[in-house]
């Protein structure tokens, strides 16, 4: 079981590396890693388990965050009342198209690898299309908008050595861009 001690923190060199593409089929170890990443998210969202093991709640985890520089992400976004939830383990995800319109979370973003709160708006694409493989090597295509699009972009950034705060405007950190949508 992954815990917070398995998650590397800001400043670790792996977080700034471009992660390696995975060859398919995945090895047994790679599959086990991806399943453990998803399990961490499930556990982190369970109040009792999270408290018992000191887990910070998360909706996404990228392999580089557990010091594995490979292009794998897990995303688990619970239903917010809209009837939609997102539960994906993706291999070699790529954003193949995106909107011009930007979106941002008014509270900014957080990250399991960043212990401090970093003030500032993180502008991302409001709509994206992702192509990836699932754990068995099947093709996946996702069209996402709003909060799910933001979460997937955050995780894919980790695969490219980018941290969320890299997107914050240093001169005007709390200023929304013109025409950007608050999510």
From Swiss-Prot:
Annotated GO MF terms = metal ion binding; peptide deformylase activity
- Which biological processes are named by the entry's GO terms? co-translational protein modification; translation
Keyword annotations: Hydrolase, Iron, Metal-binding, Protein biosynthesis
Q: Can you quote the record's cofactor note?
A: Binds 1 Fe(2+) ion.
Describe the function of this protein.
Removes the formyl group from the N-terminal Met of newly synthesized proteins. Requires at least a dipeptide for an efficient rate of reaction. N-terminal L-methionine is a prerequisite for activity but the enzyme has broad specificity at other positions.
**Family recorded in the similarity comment:** Belongs to the polypeptide deformylase family.
PANTHER family cross-referenced by the UniProt entry:
PEPTIDE DEFORMYLASE (PTHR10458), PEPTIDE DEFORMYLASE 2 (PTHR10458:SF8)
Under HAMAP family, the record lists: Pep_deformylase
Would you tell me the protein name for this molecule? Peptide deformylase
List the source organism: Staphylococcus aureus (strain COL)
């Amino acid at each position: 079981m992954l815990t917070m001690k398995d998650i590397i923190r800001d400043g670790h060199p792996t977080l700034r590396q471009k992660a390696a593409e995975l060859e398919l089929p995945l090895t047994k170890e790679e599959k086990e890693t991806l399943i453990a990443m998803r399990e961490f998210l499930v556990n982190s969202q369970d109040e009792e388990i999270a408290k018992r093991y000191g887990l910070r709640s998360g909706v996404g985890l990228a392999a580089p965050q557990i010091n594995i520089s490979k292009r794998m992400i897990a995303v688990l976004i619970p239903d917010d009342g809209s009837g939609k939830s997102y539960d994906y383990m993706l291999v070699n995800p790529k954003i193949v198209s995106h909107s011009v319109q930007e979106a941002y979370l008014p509270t900014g973003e957080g990250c399991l690898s960043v212990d401090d709160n970093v003030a500032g708006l993180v502008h991302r694409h409001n709509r994206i299309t992702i192509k990836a493989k699932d754990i068995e090597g099947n093709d996946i295509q996702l069209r996402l908008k709003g909060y799910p699009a933001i979460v997937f972009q955050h995780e894919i950034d980790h695969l490219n050595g980018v941290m969320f705060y890299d997107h914050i405007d240093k001169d005007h950190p709390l200023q929304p861009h013109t025409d950007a949508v608050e999510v």
